[in-house]
Amino acid sequence: MSRKVTVIGAGNVGATIAYTLSLGDIASQIVVVDINKEKVEGEVMDIVQGTSFREPISVIAGDYSDAADSDIVIITSGIGRKPGQSRIDLAQTNVNIMKDIAPKIAAVAPNALYVIVSNPVDIMTYVFTKVSGIPENQV
């Protein structure tokens, strides 16, 4: 099977999703994108070393151009909720992050199926759909 999956965000959730994908037969290529290049490179090295006995799979720390023609894109980017922080305060910070990501990934992977994992999920999904122009049936 040849399926390309991109994970945007190499934090705890994104790195765990990328690792889990690397263990199964869901993807033949996994691209992990994060604004923190050192973090994403370290996470990808861990994944590659932890899956060395699996069938050949390509796992790379990349950028949006590497995500071109992805079949599935999973967006996990965002700031975690801090103690005492309201859902609205969290939403505003993460909306700004989503507004930056959405047009970049939509430009290179317009036919992908998108999974939004960033919190608050309902708001982030709405923002992604509006900013990216990706049809709702792909999100």
Regions found by a protein language model. Give the residues of each.
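Rossmann-like NAD(P)(H) cofactor-binding subdomain of soluble oxidoreductases
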Residues: 86-139
